[in-house]
Amino acid sequence: NVFQEGAASLLGEDDYEFVGPLPPSAFSEEDRILYDLIAKFESAGSYDAVNVLWYPSGKGGGAFEISSDLNATFEGSKISELSFGKIKKLQSTYFTVRYPKTKPANSFFAMGKFQVIPKTMRLVRANMDFSDSDIYSPENQDRIIEFLIYSGKKRKKLSNYLLNVGSTTLDQAQIDLAQEFSSVPQPNGSSYYGNETSHHSSETIRTALKNARDANKKNGRTSY
């Protein structure tokens, strides 16, 4: 697999473990490396990963409890087999009670390979063409990460940097990415979120961002 060989070259053979399928797509090798770097510590690369959060203090930004499952199912179906309508229902608890004090039943907070949270999923549904009956499949999850990284609907500095638009710096793009994914470090190596820990080295992320930007420039890509 050319992409896996490229990732191994970037990170070192023993530092990169692919989990789950890599569905075919039009992603460049450089984009795929970036996306799987993000997924490595968000979900171990599993399209069926979920997190459930609750806050004993009832407030955000402080201590929280988390329950994680890399191969979650609901009513006998894998997460990647559920409809977007079902996903919406499973995440709806967090719109009713954003900071539940106890673990909410039949609810998930972050879902899938890229750990899409309720607020982000709402943005996705408002801007992409998914219906309630469409499936949260590996292919559609990959479409979502492409949207989040490149559309500029949520992280404009990140998309501008990758598409060589304007004067956005690498530091600004990395901070944007760190705001979206807590496992991604800021330029100084720390997580953007004080109550969480980044897992990647800053240099690894910066290399992946620069490589994706250079590939887009070489290929003449300037838009989502």
Regions from the PLM with identified roles:
Residues 2-135, 140-224:
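Cell-wall polysaccharide-cleaving catalytic domain and substrate-binding groove, primarily
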